[in-house]
């Protein structure tokens, strides 16, 4: 008796695979010719909570409109209509991540040693004075007389 002979049993592999509802590109449905980079409210729907552009498989946009959408978002970010990062990152600043190595390794203890201040020794050096003979300008400009 083969599998085809058993009408009450499901096909091999059990239940059928889950097939999600096919997503339709909202720009194609609305017949949008150009995606406006100035419409930040519409563009914000295609940005994740971390400030990244959502992929096609999540938003359902077609390849053509996904490229145009990415360019519009980048243009809006460049002229400061949209943020590059999400709001919680802007509010908190650069938050250090947890590092288990840093937490497990104790900080080195500095031995409290008596540190004596450095003593500066200044040696006096005698510099001989050199006297140069300076001629007045009037005498220096006269040519030497030949005898």
From Swiss-Prot:
GO cellular component, one term: cytosolic small ribosomal subunit
Keyword terms of this UniProt record: Ribonucleoprotein, Ribosomal protein, RNA-binding, rRNA-binding
Pfam family, one: Ribosomal_S18
One example of a Gene Ontology biological process annotation: translation
Keyword RNA-binding: yes
Record's subunit section: Part of the 30S ribosomal subunit. Forms a tight heterodimer with protein bS6.
PANTHER family reported for this sequence: 30S RIBOSOMAL PROTEIN S18, SMALL RIBOSOMAL SUBUNIT PROTEIN BS18M
Name this protein carries in UniProt: Small ribosomal subunit protein bS18
Lineage of the species this protein comes from: Bacteria, Bacillati, Chloroflexota, Dehalococcoidia, Dehalococcoidales
